C-alpha cells in the first residue's frame, strides 16, 4: 500500500476506499426485522397473534390446526386446499412471539423431476409464489405475507384464496411437467 517514498499510491488508495464503501454498503443493506409490538386490532389478522391467522384461515373455509414448529419453536398452522396439505410458518418472531410475517408452504420429496429448471419454469410466470429446490432435491413452493399492523378479514381471505389458487395451478403444472418415471409410465399406456 505504501510506495517506497512513504506515500500511498493512487491504486492502493482507491482499493482501500472501494473496500471501505463495500463494507459500509453491506452493513447498511442487512435487513432489519420489525417486531409487531402493537396489539393485533379487533377483527384483524396478524402474525403477532397466531390465533387470528388460524381463525382467518377457518373463516376463509379451510381447516387450521395451530401448533409450534419443532425446529424453530415458532407458531405454525397445518391446513389443506385443492388436495394438498400445507403449512403456514411464522417468521421474524422473538422467542416464538411478536412475529411479523407468515409463509404458506408446501414441500415435496425428490421424485426425480425436482430441478432448478422446473423451479425456474414455475417462477417465470407466477407472481405470488416461489418454487425452490433444496440441496436434498426436495421441492418447496411458498407464498410470503407481511402482516405488521394487521390485515383485515377481507384482505386475508384474498391472501388465502390466492394461495389456494396457486395450489390448483401447482396440480396443473405437475401434470404438464411430470416426473421422469410418471412420464415414462404415461408413454407406455
Where are these regions (language model features)?
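A short, solvent-exposed beta-edge/loop patch
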Residues: 127-171
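Short, Lys/Arg-enriched N-terminal segments with co-localized hydrophobic residues
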Residues: 1-13
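N-terminal signal peptide c-region/cleavage motif recognized by signal peptidases
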Residues: 29-31
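Charge-rich, low-complexity N-terminal segments
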Residues: 33-83
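Sec-dependent signal peptide recognition
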Residues: 15-22
Amino acid at each position: 500500500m505504501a510506495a517506497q517514498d512513504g506515500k500511498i499510491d493512487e491504486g492502493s488508495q482507491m482499493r482501500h476506499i472501494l473496500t471501505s464503501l463495500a463494507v459500509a454498503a453491506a452493513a447498511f443493506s442487512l435487513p432489519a426485522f420489525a417486531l409487531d409490538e402493537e396489539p393485533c386490532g379487533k377483527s384483524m389478522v396478524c402474525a403477532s397473534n397466531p390465533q387470528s391467522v388460524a381463525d382467518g384461515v377457518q373463516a376463509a373455509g379451510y381447516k387450521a390446526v395451530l401448533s409450534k414448529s419443532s425446529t424453530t419453536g415458532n407458531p405454525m398452522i397445518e391446513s389443506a386446499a385443492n388436495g394438498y396439505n400445507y403449512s403456514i410458518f411464522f417468521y421474524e418472531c422473538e422467542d416464538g412471539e411478536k412475529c411479523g410475517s407468515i409463509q404458506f408452504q408446501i414441500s415435496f420429496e425428490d421424485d426425480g423431476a425436482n430441478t432448478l429448471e422446473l423451479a425456474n419454469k414455475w417462477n417465470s410466470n407466477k407472481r405470488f409464489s416461489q418454487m425452490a429446490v433444496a440441496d436434498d432435491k426436495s421441492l418447496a413452493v411458498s407464498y410470503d405475507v407481511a402482516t405488521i399492523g394487521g390485515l383485515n378479514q377481507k384482505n386475508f381471505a384474498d391472501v388465502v384464496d390466492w394461495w389456494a389458487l396457486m395450489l390448483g395451478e401447482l396440480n396443473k403444472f405437475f401434470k404438464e411437467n411430470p416426473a421422469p418415471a410418471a412420464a415414462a409410465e404415461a408413454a407406455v399406456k
